[in-house]
Regions:
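TPR repeat positional signature
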Residues: 8, 20, 27, 57, ...
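TPR/TPR-like (Sel1-like) alpha-helical repeat modules
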Residues: 43-49, 108-119, 147-148, 331-347
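Short helix-capping/linker turns of helical repeat alpha-solenoids
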Residues: 14-16, 30-31, 51-54, 67, ...
Length: 519
């Protein structure tokens, strides 16, 4: 470094404003014996002693390209220099405002000022911007200015697109992407990522992404999907599989259907965490007419979707398992999934759960009257009162209500009436899973389990066997004048058998079952 350069640095460090500005300029440009180092140049030009001065702002505006100025958050300095009459600052500020959705009037003002200062490109940009439609405004203003005066048109269009994406401005995002593609920006990973993000934004806003070339859309999806972008893989998989993609024009996937390729992309998206893809995979592989039909794989995809919390998958899996159930464990697993779906508001799942519950004979008994009767029974026999409440909430027969173990039978979704050891006839004594059709029923089961759990030591001695319980219940009902129909369900062995075995239940509930699987 020359002696005069060392002296200039010393003056700058001693507080000379002019020296600071000159050192900063030389570092920004890498001239006059100084290496180019933007960070050091900024440090000199942004010294607190220079705050609010126009000279350092003009140096920044003239020395750095617009994209670098914006990346370094030098918008205020650019505005200060433009207001001071700096032609380069007026041009760059006008262009940057033109790249923003709400900056048209400011852009015309600053570009007009640059045009009056003698900048021919600014005059062309003003004329183009004044006549351009909003969708073409970005391209119109960039074309006469691109690749001149430190202006990289394609790069600026991409930066403006990112800003529009951050602000959720879909229309302006499309305009910026159109400009980037129109100015010859290569469809690299960065631009393809913005195109995919535009599709995602359109999907979130319930709109269709119009205005972009269909080839660019498809190429962007394929490029990003190949790089592991799950959103791109999900969209591409749906489109190639013939599933409607509302966020894209139909022309994008016209003549592009390929089930095997689409299923592969859907599987890639699902594996990356796009949970909705599992259900699409199930539908594709469950369709026997499809070239990728595979019932076993379809079931696997349905289970995956159910595990990820999708109500439709939980309902369909529960319905299929219940239809195939031949053991209590199968029924319990099926009811678990139906209960999960019903908890999310699935009406079909709720209907199927209700089909497993026997109706109480005296449905017209008022809740107030039932509550009063239960209180009377509770004073005489609290264990029986709990059993009666369970019976009415879950639709149990008299045998089931008097023999059920509320502690062992409690489940997160309802109640399991275990095998009745006091009855020899298999069809009457076999265990049965009964779902809670609402939160109130589940609360009754939990209260009963808590009561019997606390009093388990004395419950056996107090209640006796089934014969003793039945005798005590009958005598208490006679004394209190209660009707058994208000608490117990009346069902034949054949009806109970139909609720235990999947094939028989499926025939009994064929209408709601068909609706649940088709919905």
């Amino acid at each position: 470094m020359r002696r005069q350069d060392i002296q200039l640095l010393a003056q700058a460090r001693q507080g000379d404003s002019a020296a600071r500005c000159e050192v900063g300029r030389r570092y920004l440009l890498g001239v006059n014996g100084f290496p180019q180092h933007v960070a050091t140049g900024l440090e000199y030009l942004r010294h607190p002693s220079l705050a609010g001065q126009c000279a350092p702002a003009r140096i920044l505006a003239e020395a750095l390209p617009l994209d670098q100025l914006m990346a370094l958050q030098q918008g205020p300095a650019l505005a200060l220099a433009a207001a001071d009459g700096c032609l380069a600052a007026q041009l760059k500020l006008g262009l940057w405002r033109a790249l923003q959705a709400d900056g048209r009037s400011d852009a015309l003002r600053w570009l007009g000022a640059a045009a009056k200062g003698g900048h021919a490109g600014a005059a062309q940009a003003v004329a183009a911007l004044a006549q351009a439609a909003p969708a073409q405004a970005v391209l119109a203003v960039l074309q006469p200015l691109a690749d001149g005066d430190g202006i990289d048109g394609p790069l600026l269009a991409r930066l403006a697109a990112q800003q529009a994406l951050d602000g959720g401005q879909l229309d302006h995002l499309v305009a910026c992407l159109v400009a980037a593609l129109g100015l010859g920006h290569a469809l690299d990973s960065a631009l393809a990522s913005l195109v995919v993000a535009a599709e995602q934004l359109a999907d979130q806003q319930g709109r269709s992404l119009a205005g972009l070339p269909t080839a660019a859309l498809l190429d962007s999806l394929e490029l990003r999907a190949g790089q592991g972008d799950r959103a791109a893989a999900y969209t591409l998989g749906r489109g190639l599989s013939g599933v409607d993609v509302a966020s894209l024009p139909p022309a994008v996937f016209a003549g592009q259907q390929n089930l095997r390729k689409g299923a592969a992309f859907l599987l890639r998206a699902a594996d990356a965490g796009q949970d909705a893809a599992w259900l699409h995979l199930y539908r594709l592989h469950a369709d026997h007419r499809s070239s990728v039909a595979n019932p076993q794989l379809a079931r696997f995809f349905l289970e995956k979707a159910a595990l990820r919390g999708q109500a439709e998958a939980q309902r369909k899996l529960g319905a299929l398992q219940l239809r195939e159930a031949s053991h209590l464990q199968d029924s319990e697993q099926a009811i678990h999934w139906l209960h999960q779906a019903a908890a999310q508001g699935d009406a079909h799942a709720t209907t199927l759960l209700q089909s497993l519950r026997l109706p109480v004979a005296d449905v017209d008994a008022g809740e107030a009257a039932v509550a009063f009767a239960l209180e009377q029974v509770r004073r005489a026999d609290p264990w029986l009162a709990q059993r009666l409440a369970l019976s009415r909430a879950f639709g149990l027969t008299k045998l089931e209500a008097l023999s059920v173990d509320p502690v062992a039978g409690l489940r997160p979704w309802g109640l399991v009436v275990g095998r009745n050891p006091f009855i020899a006839q298999v069809r009457l004594s076999a265990p049965r899973a009964v779902p809670a059709v609402d939160e109130a029923a589940l609360a009754v089961a939990r209260r009963a389990a808590a009561f019997f759990g606390q009093a388990q030591g004395e419950a056996g001695a107090a209640e006796g066997d089934l014969r003793a319980r039945s005798l005590r219940q009958r005598r208490l009902f006679e004394r209190l004048g209660l009707d058994e129909a208000a608490f117990f369900c009346d069902a034949s062995a054949m009806t109970l058998d139909a609720l235990r075995l999947g094939a028989k239940w499926a025939y009994r509930a064929r209408a709601p079952l068909s609706e649940a699987l088709a919905a």
